């Protein structure tokens, strides 16, 4: 069955989650990389734990809480950076090949969208900053159903809105756990494995693995292979 839509995860896939700390690396000091990793890991952990417990807080609130935890774990990083880091995260830099990849897919007549844990305001800020809006048909946020990926209800936002079958969607994510959830739902998934990480969740394998977004338009799954 031919692919009709390419749907992208946002954070880590289109937008660089470490760009905020990278911008202030000199000020953050020796613990900058560890600080950024903790911030990201705690952001995800809080989302998963809330969903598992049947509760919800929007992703921006969790991003703030996770940042505070990173400061607590890395006391050498100056807390005075907090406002600047949050401002940067609100308008995260896109990866260099993100815009061209979306443009190439749109040129093939495919629908394109974002499906993200991010809150609507976060996503709007990032999309506007990266100037991706013209190449997106939709931006879906979990905020509408108040539950986080990898729950199946999140992926159903796409099929319901576009009135298409799961197997007509190519879902693109750099997060292997997200690829697992989307594969379980029925999407045909592409894992963007920039860091050449070893695979996991073998029973929920992606149909393709790429190192960069600009490889997407040439994939044979576009023609339904």
Which residues does each predicted region cover?
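Asp-based, Mg2+/Mn2+-dependent phosphohydrolase catalytic module
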Residues: 1-3, 103, 115, 119-225
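Active-site neighborhood of HAD-like aspartate-dependent phosphohydrolases
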Residues: 1-44
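An amphipathic alpha-helix signature
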Residues: 21-22, 36, 40, 60-68, ...
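Short helix-capping segments at alpha-helix termini
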Residues: 28-32, 73-80, 107, 131-135, ...
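Residues at secondary-structure transition points
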Residues: 30, 34, 54-58, 80, ...
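A metal-dependent, Asp-based hydrolase signature
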Residues: 33, 47-83
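Short, acidic loop-to-helix structural element flanking the phosphoryl-transfer center
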Residues: 60-61, 78-114, 124, 152
């Amino acid at each position: 069955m031919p692919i009709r839509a390419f749907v992208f995860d946002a954070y880590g896939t289109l937008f660089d989650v470490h760009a905020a700390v990278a911008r202030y690396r000199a000020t953050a000091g020796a613990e900058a990389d560890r600080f950024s990793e903790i911030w990201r890991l705690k952001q995800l952990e809080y989302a998963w734990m809330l969903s598992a417990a049947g509760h919800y807080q929007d992703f921006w609130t969790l991003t703030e809480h996770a940042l505070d935890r990173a400061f607590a774990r890395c006391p050498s990083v100056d807390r005075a950076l907090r406002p600047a880091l949050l401002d940067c995260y609100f308008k995260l830099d896109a990866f260099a090949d993100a815009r061209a990849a979306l443009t190439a897919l749109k040129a093939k007549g495919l629908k394109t969208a974002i499906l993200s844990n991010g809150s609507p305001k976060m996503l709007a800020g990032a999309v506007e900053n990266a100037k991706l809006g013209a190449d997106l048909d939709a931006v879906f946020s979990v905020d509408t159903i108040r539950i986080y990926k990898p729950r199946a209800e999140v992926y159903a936002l796409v099929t319901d809105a576009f009135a298409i079958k799961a197997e007509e969607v190519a879902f693109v994510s750099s997060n292997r756990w997200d690829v697992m959830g989307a594969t379980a739902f029925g999407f045909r998934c592409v894992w963007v494995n920039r860091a050449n990480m070893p695979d996991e969740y073998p029973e929920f394998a992606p149909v393709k693995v790429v190192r960069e977004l600009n490889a997407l338009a040439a994939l044979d799954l576009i023609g339904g292979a």
